Amino acid sequence: PQETGLTYNSWFGKFHLEMIWWHQSHFPLWGHPELLNRTLGWYHRAEPVARQIAERQGFDGIRWMKMTDPDAMEAPSKVGSFLIWQQPHLIHLAELVYRATKDEAVLKNYYDLVMKTAEFMYSFATYDEANDRYILKGIIAAQETLRASENLNPPMELSSWHYGLSTAQLWRERMGEPRVAEWDTLLAKLSPLAKDAEGKLYLASEDATDSYTNKRFISDHPAVTGALGMYPESRLLDKEIMNNTIDKIFEVWNWDETWGWDYPMIAMCAARVGEPDK
């Protein structure tokens, strides 16, 4: 899918895999899982290339890249190669199709892809021995103003990692397979969302302590809201702090530097904290 939909030719029509969630995750929710299911066949065709990418980079499983050609070969990008928020989408989308259909054939069709996607996610996370936790680093966040060389534990990615691995474990249970102990360890020790010094706001990432005063961090996607807007509540976050964070975003954000999907993301986050009229 394109990043800006069907009416504007962004990036010369290049393929942006993270946009499939925005373009098609809604279909199963209003009675048309078959439309999403039809598209998900691409992941089967792309799996050999995605597996080679993960292997070349020293990871397990399969890595879904942000920007590729239609056959999943990487397209050159100084940003796209560092993004990871598209990685759990296959798990999320397959789960939505299964929930809508309750068809065991869906589990069988996507089970191997779900497992290999989760294997990459586990191997990509880094164990921080000094603090006995798992972290996400060396990435550009969905809020692309955060630099890969500095970025540590961006909030939306943390939530997506927790959701993706939790759901992969649920698929194992549905298929009569035991849970993977190492995945459960990661889920228990995955870093929570980073907070400001007063503990009242969530940061753009753990290193971005000036998240609401530095123009770089109040521009682009307010991706911190995606941690709850796109993914369900988890032990990683607190709704009251997220509500405070939404209020702060409304107060200080550089709205001229936002994108179309930022607004539904904030709206869904507001609904989940009990403030749908925001």
Which residues are covered by each model-predicted region?
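Active-site core of glycosidic bond-cleaving carbohydrate-active enzymes
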Residues: 16-52, 83-100, 104, 108, ...
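Segments forming glycine/polar-rich beta-alpha architectures that bind adenosine-containing cofactors
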Residues: 5-15, 19-20
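Flexible loop/turn segments at secondary-structure boundaries
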Residues: 6-9, 100, 142-146, 275-276
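Acidic/histidine-rich catalytic neighborhood
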Residues: 116, 120-174
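Extracytoplasmic, non-cytosolic globular domains
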Residues: 90, 111-115, 119-120
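Active-site-adjacent "gating/activation" loops or surface patches in catalytic cores
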Residues: 5, 46-88
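Beta-strand segments within the central parallel beta-sheet cores of soluble alpha/beta enzyme folds
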Residues: 38-42, 55, 107-115, 133-139
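Glycine- and aromatic-rich loop/turn segments at beta-sheet edges
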Residues: 1-9, 51-66, 123-140, 197-207, ...
